[in-house]
């Protein structure tokens, strides 16, 4: 019981900064038809209701592709695509409207009761739908008439903002009308992307069948920049994937990132609570798409002393690192490089140059426990090498008692104490008996 209480307290402490940061912000959530079909949809709806109760302004955009296809098959209506875009003739349009209308009612009903059987029972959630999107036809391409398949002509952002300010969740479906009163079938990814851009949303969030974007080892890629997103799209297309919820969202996320949407998140609709884990934890659970990495490597300054101390004190107590006083750190802070993630220092290292011998010491290497099975150590080493070269140093050495093999795997070789610069040799602690490893930079 005590362990569970401790976990709850720690989890809440870690979540509070994100609760405060997200309050009042606009999030666009894209629910694919596949996500709506899946058994965990009730959990997703409950989490959306919880986000609303925390003061986050929500626009929910839903798709209905599998539901439309099911309707068409039931009515024996041919399903036609051109360049991976549905051709919506009059017969198909009726089934599109039927599927979209049914989902609108279902999602509205579920959101309205999402906080029942919770401590927030009794809190009302207003869900508003309307003609927020004005559509226009896609027209004819290569002799193929898309009929009632359309694209966005304009978005009534004033009306959407008005509903958000009144505390409502705005729900937008895939059917929109034109200035002539005709109905058109739009893609949910276009709506979600353009709404995110026009309303200057903080985040665009999508759901897929996997835990975000998966690499060749089967692991989730936690962060992608636009160029990397494009590479992932090419990989998926190379496998014949042109219309999955993953690739559709990735295409939209590139436009969103380049147009000012801070972050786009892709998470699994299979995983219960994925939405909350992604938004209220430092590392999330899926893949986020950003213009600029949430993680930065930079030279430390005096304001980073507290973060460095939190990182190195546990290692000093274990005898892994030599103890440094706060005063010493303050005098030497310009020697330190840190990796920072969401204002948390997650790794550090220092470079002490010996200009006479043209050698540098890499020291005080520390990585936060949550990130030790990652590449942060390699990133620090690479940065230390670059910094040393800028100072015209020819070699780097380290003194270590615990990480001998790690450095050897990266090209360092064991050397004798006599190789050290004279001033460092005089300070060598023979009782500690640290191993000395060195690497040539040129």
UniProtKB/Swiss-Prot annotation:
The molecular function terms of the Gene Ontology recorded here are: L-glutamate N-acetyltransferase activity
Q: What is its EC number?
A: 2.3.1.1
Instruction: Give every N-acetyltransferase domain span.
Output: 295-442
Hey, which pathway is this one from?
Amino-acid biosynthesis; L-arginine biosynthesis; N(2)-acetyl-L-ornithine from L-glutamate: step 1/4
Keywords of this entry: Acyltransferase, Amino-acid biosynthesis, Arginine biosynthesis, Cytoplasm, Transferase
Assembly behavior = Homohexamer.
Q: Which NCBIfam families match?
A: N-Ac-Glu-synth (TIGR01890), PRK05279.1 (NF003641)
Q: What is this protein called?
A: Amino-acid acetyltransferase
User: What taxonomic lineage is listed for the species of origin?
Assistant: Bacteria, Pseudomonadati, Pseudomonadota, Gammaproteobacteria, Enterobacterales
